[in-house]
Amino acid sequence: MPLNVSFANRNYDLDYDSMQPYFFCDEEENFYHQQQQSELQPPAPSEDIWKKFELLPTPPLSPSRRSGLCSPSYVAFASFSPRDVDDGGGGSFSTADQLEMVTELLGGDMVNQSFICDPDDETFIKNIIIQDCMWSGFSAAAKLVSEKLASYQAARKDGGGRSPARGQGACSTSSLYLQDLSAAVSECIDPSVVFPYPLNDSSSPKPCASPDSTAFSPSSDSLLSSAASSPRASPEPLALHEETPPTTSSDSEEEQEDEEEIDVVSVEKRQPPAKRSESGSPSAGSHSKPPHSPLVLKRCHVSTHQHNYAAPPSTRKDYPPTKRAKLDSGRVLKQISNNRKCASPRSSDSEENDKRRTHNVLERQRRNELKRSFFALRDQIPELENNEKAPKVVILKKATAYILAIQAEEQKLISEKDLLRKRREQLKHKLEQLRNSCA
């Protein structure tokens, strides 16, 4: 399908500059005329005074298509066969026109809206966005921009010296593109200059190869074909790139943005720049496990179940066995609650509440036992045996009188017993005398 059907004679500067959208509050009023009159004469009492200072509500101008030819779709332009362009009459277009056609087709205007800079400028390396760790995800995008700019510059230099004839075939175009790619790789920014420490093993950009490296030399055809199929740098070895299918520029940009998301919260390991450059070289076949660093932050759980040594010793008393089990269970629960609150300043208050509660339990137990004793005493008094509502004072008085009566009767019985014993003794003596007289 020829790509220059509808893009043959289009001037993008005129299209964007001549059709600027303007927004008016009312279509019938003359905005410029009203503004000029408001500048010359003061506003009427019924007129809004702020209309005098009102500006034209125009949106920001779009960047010129001619000034930003560093579009990321240049890689996609080099990937398709130039035979389609030549067959469709594309031989009369320059390299810039073909780049604009591919940019319009793919809609790749990311670079014009985000990064418009010169890769040879020293301020590009010292840019605060690159130096900032929060914006370090844009370093790979900036590197991509520098590669595209370098490739476009090489294409312009070669395009100025070439003849207008473009019927050489796919081999010449692909070799030219590979030379531009090697030039772009040689001019890219070394991440070791910008980032002395790696941000992440999977997302950190690898240092670019030198211009004299064999990985990007035009003599090695297999590696160059793999670089043509995937023009973006990858953390994996270059030998594995031959099996990867060719991808478009938009897909590869989305994949790179997904891969280079950086977790700002986590604290990653730090290696010296020498070791990082050795581990990040393309000749490394496998990623070694990073050594443990003391800078890694870990969350640990501190147990709060500790004994409160500052608490005063509890004074235990010997209680009856029937109530000791309940008191022990209550103390166990209270000790658990006190251990949970050992770090709070209310530990002494909780201990006082525990002692007060224990005292209340013991007092209630004493009162219950006293009541049972009164009931037992009432049952022993004949006058109050069947009186369940007898007060304690009456029970005590009747009990005292009953005890005194019992004691008096006891003394009477004791004296009577003594008299009977004496009488027995007398009778026994008299019986003995009678036996002796009969004998």
From Swiss-Prot:
Q: Where is this region: Leucine-zipper?
A: 413-434
Q: Residue ranges under compositional bias (Acidic residues)?
A: 251-263
Name a GO CC annotation attached to this entry: cytoplasm
Question: What ranges does the record list as Low complexity composition bias?
Answer: 209-238, 279-288
Report any Pfam family annotated for this entry.
Answer: HLH
Q: Where is the composition biased (Polar residues)?
A: 335-347
Where does this protein reside within or beyond the cell?
Answer: Nucleus, Nucleoplasm; Nucleus, Nucleolus; Nucleus; Cytoplasm
Query: In which residue ranges is the amino acid composition biased (Basic and acidic residues)?
Result: 266-278, 315-331
Q: Where is this motif: UBR5-degron?
A: 355-364
Q: Which residue range or ranges hold the bHLH domain?
A: 354-406
Q: State which residues carry a glycan (glycosylated).
A: 58
Among InterPro entries, the record links this protein to:
bHLH_dom (IPR011598), HLH_DNA-bd_sf (IPR036638), Myc-LZ (IPR003327), Myc_transcription_factors (IPR050433), Tscrpt_reg_Myc (IPR002418), Tscrpt_reg_Myc_N (IPR012682)
Short motif 9aaTAD, span: 100-108
Query: What biological processes does GO assign it?
Result: chromatin remodeling; chromosome organization; DNA damage response; G1/S transition of mitotic cell cycle; intracellular iron ion homeostasis; MAPK cascade; negative regulation of cell division; negative regulation of monocyte differentiation
Residue positions where Phosphoserine is found in the record: 6, 62, 71, 81, 151, 293, 314, 329, 344, 347-348
Q: Which CDD domains is this protein grouped with?
A: bHLHzip_c-Myc (cd11458)
Summarize what the UniProt record says about post-translational modification: Phosphorylated by PRKDC. Phosphorylation at Ser-329 by PIM2 leads to the stabilization of MYC. Phosphorylation at Ser-62 by CDK2 prevents Ras-induced senescence. Phosphorylated at Ser-62 by DYRK2; this primes the protein for subsequent phosphorylation by GSK3B at Thr-58. Phosphorylation at Thr-58 and Ser-62 by GSK3 is required for ubiquitination and degradation by the proteasome. Dephosphorylation at multiple sites by the PNUTS-PP1 complex promotes MYC stability by preventing ubiquitination by the SCF(FBXW7) complex.
PANTHER family per record:
MYC PROTO-ONCOGENE (PTHR45851)
Subunit comment: Efficient DNA binding requires dimerization with another bHLH protein. Binds DNA as a heterodimer with MAX. Interacts with TAF1C and SPAG9. Interacts with PARP10. Interacts with KDM5A and KDM5B. Interacts (when phosphorylated at Thr-58 and Ser-62) with FBXW7. Interacts with PIM2. Interacts with RIOX1. The heterodimer MYC:MAX interacts with ABI1; the interaction may enhance MYC:MAX transcriptional activity. Interacts with TRIM6. Interacts with NPM1; the binary complex is recruited to the promoter of MYC target genes and enhances their transcription. Interacts with NUP205.
Give the protein name, as stated in the record.
Answer: Myc proto-oncogene protein
Organism source for this protein? Tadarida brasiliensis
* Gene, per the UniProt record: MYC
